[in-house]
Structures are given as structure tokens and as C-alpha cells.
């Protein structure tokens, strides 16, 4: 039996979180955990240890940059890859930057189920490539 990749979605839009959860879990390859604000998302990241965090940029109380900063400065969460989710940019802006801004992959809202799955798969391919490269350096 293949283990499912665990993804934590931190986004204040409950309907979007449910869309992501349904879309990714329907593939049978992902287990999706949802948190609707920054502080609870940080707590879930610390306890659940996901393989990827999908993090909204604009949220009340604590925005995505603040959440990412907190996670990146904690020993137990700093190695968890983060992909930002935003409706603040358009697809052309992100494509000009090859899908990355300041080293983080971006997923643009609104998004279709097919696009979401493709982009999450792409992020996991990058994660795997990075892990394999680091392992080859240690060998």
C-alpha cells in the first residue's frame, strides 16, 4: 500500500479549503489537513508534520508571510516546503517568474481542480529532486 502525501492547507476561505481537500484527496494520493487561520495552521504544522504546506498570503490576524516566517524559524517546521496561494497576482505575473517569487512556488486563485492537482504534483516533483540532490551530496 502506498502512503499518501500529507498536505496542510492554511487559508481563511473555508470553501476554498474544502475545494482543495476534495480535489486532492479524490486523486487517492494525498491526505489534506485544513486550518483556517495562521496561528492554528502553525500549531497543525508542528503536530502533523505535513510534507507540504499550501499557505494563503492574505489572511486576518496573521498573514501568510508572517506564518511562513514563524515556520521557517522553528527547528521542527523549517524544512517543510511551502507553496503560497494567492488571488493577489494573476497567472501572467507568476509565469514571468517561472512560478516562483522569492524562492517560493505560487498557486494562483481561482484555480480548476485539474490545475491544482498539476501544480501540487509539480511542487512534489521539485521537493523530490531537491531531496535526491541533498542525499547525493551526503553519499
Where are these regions (language model features)?
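CheY-like receiver
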Residues: 125-139
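Charged docking surfaces used in two-component/phosphorelay signaling
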Residues: 18-26
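Acidic catalytic/metal-coordinating carboxylates
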Residues: 37-40, 63-69
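Alpha4 helix (beta4-alpha4-beta5 surface) of REC/receiver domains from two-component response regulators
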Residues: 66, 78, 89-108, 114-121
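Short hydrophobic/Thr-rich beta-strand motif most characteristic of the beta2 strand and flanking loop
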Residues: 29-36, 44
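Receiver (REC) domain active-site loop signature in two-component systems and cognate sites
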Residues: 59
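Active-site residues of response regulator receiver
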Residues: 11, 56, 86
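Active-site beta3 strand of CheY-like receiver
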Residues: 48-54
Amino acid at each position: 500500500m502506498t502512503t499518501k502525501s500529507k498536505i496542510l492547507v492554511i487559508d481563511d476561505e473555508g470553501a476554498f479549503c474544502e475545494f482543495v481537500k476534495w480535489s486532492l484527496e479524490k486523486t487517492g494520493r494525498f491526505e489534506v489537513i485544513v486550518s483556517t487561520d495562521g496561528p492554528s495552521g502553525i500549531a497543525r504544522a508542528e503536530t502533523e508534520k505535513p510534507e507540504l504546506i499550501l499557505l494563503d498570503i492574505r489572511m486576518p490576524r496573521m498573514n501568510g508571510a508572517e506564518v511562513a516566517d514563524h515556520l521557517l524559524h522553528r527547528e521542527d517546521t523549517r524544512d517543510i516546503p511551502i507553496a503560497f496561494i494567492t488571488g493577489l497576482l494573476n497567472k501572467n505575473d507568476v509565469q514571468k517568474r517561472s512560478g516562483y517569487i522569492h524562492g517560493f512556488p505560487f498557486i494562483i486563485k481561482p484555480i480548476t481542480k485539474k490545475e491544482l492537482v498539476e501544480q501540487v504534483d509539480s511542487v512534489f516533483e521539485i521537493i523530490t529532486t531537491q531531496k535526491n540532490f541533498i542525499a547525493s551530496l551526503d553519499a
